[in-house]
Amino acid sequence: MKYDLIIIGSGSVGAAAGYYATRAGLKVLMTDAHMPPHQQGSHHGDTRLIRHAYGEGEKYVPLVLRAQTLWDELSTHNEEPIFVRSGVVNLGPADSAFLANVARSAQQWQLNVERLDATALMTRWPEIRVPDNYIGLFEADSGFLRSELAITTWLRLAREAGCAQLFNSPVSHIHHDDNGVTIETSEGSYHASKALISAGTWVKALVPELPVQPVRKVFAWFKADGRYSTKNRFPAFTGEMPNGDQYYGFPAENDELKIGKHNGGQLIQAPEERKPFAAVASDGAEAFPFLRNVLPGIGGCLHGAACTYDNSPDEDFIIDTLPGHENTLVITGLSGHGFKFAPVLGEIAADFALGKTPSFDLTPFRLSRFSQ
């Protein structure tokens, strides 16, 4: 059997692509080296932020707004919502370049973002402490996503729509010819007109020339109480320290507040190098500088987890066809800020398989930028 689209890697982007392409009427085969959702990629740990006024650059805003529409639609397929509109407050020094980008994105796209000085911040959320020179940019319409629930939902919907799924079966080779793409797996060979490579951190095992660097990251849950929950209107947050370190976190659930550090981490070259949480001496203390200064009421570390970022050289996404192979789309280099975009990236992949022109300007995400 020849498929219209084979998906290599069915985590966040691959799961979304499998659903949207199958829903569009294509014959799709989803593959994964493991059984998604799983612990080997970048999507586990229950929750991920979604921000609209994007500090990483205005080029992402149209993508994230489309993603939000798709998240809202996906949430209708579950009793438990996938998107929780908790609001997100972005904290940092008033002269922060990241916050300047947030403000610029909000202004250009007329987004609902409120600027709060330090006094107003601490009045609204007495649990938060910041220096006098800090501000907060509060996005009331943003919030967080239930990442593993999202992937489970896409996989179920794709399967119900007739998508073939081959999991726990790593792809060992990809072959291109005039008739399309052939993959080799432990279960045999499969052929399609087009392929999506969304293999995440270890994409270089299949495409060695891609400029992607795996980075071991950790996040952890700390003892909290009801003051830090959505019931008390406590928001999700990003926070920049005076030294430039970037943190992110979520409202407490079951008296546990999850937080992680966006920058830093350990460069790794193989999956076995991603040691479990607490294997690196600094893991449990990584969030202390932020918690001590900004959330001093939070208690000790309860447990944590390790994940992996697939960093591109400029930490912007890679969305492009492989050089010399226009029938193969690669989406990688999401650099630790990609999950919120998963549905729109999946939709872009489905449009690629359908032969449609992308609805977005993807020029900033082309591979050619690294050779200029």
Swiss-Prot record:
What this protein catalyses is: N(alpha)-methyl-L-tryptophan + O2 + H2O = L-tryptophan + formaldehyde + H2O2
One Pfam family cited in the UniProt record for this chain: DAO
Job of this protein: Catalyzes the oxidative demethylation of N-methyl-L-tryptophan.
- Supply the name of the protein: N-methyl-L-tryptophan oxidase
Family annotation (InterPro entries): FAD-dep_OxRdtase (IPR006076), FAD/NAD-bd_sf (IPR036188), Me_Trp_Oxase_MTOX (IPR023493), MTOX (IPR045170)
> S-8alpha-FAD cysteine (modified residue): where?
307
This enzyme's EC code(s): 1.5.3.-
Residues engaged in binding FAD? 4-34
**HAMAP family reported in the protein's UniProt record:** MTOX
List the GO molecular function terms.
flavin adenine dinucleotide binding; N-methyl-L-amino-acid oxidase activity; sarcosine oxidase activity
Which controlled-vocabulary keywords does the entry list? FAD, Flavoprotein, Oxidoreductase
Share what the entry says about its subunit structure, partners included: Monomer.
Cellular component terms per the entry's GO annotation? cytosol
- Keyword Signal assigned to the entry: answer is no
Source superkingdom: Bacteria
Cofactor remark: Binds 1 FAD per subunit.
Q: Which family does it belong to?
A: Belongs to the MSOX/MTOX family. MTOX subfamily.
- Cofactors required: FAD
| Gene name for this UniProt entry | solA
The protein's enzyme class: oxidoreductase
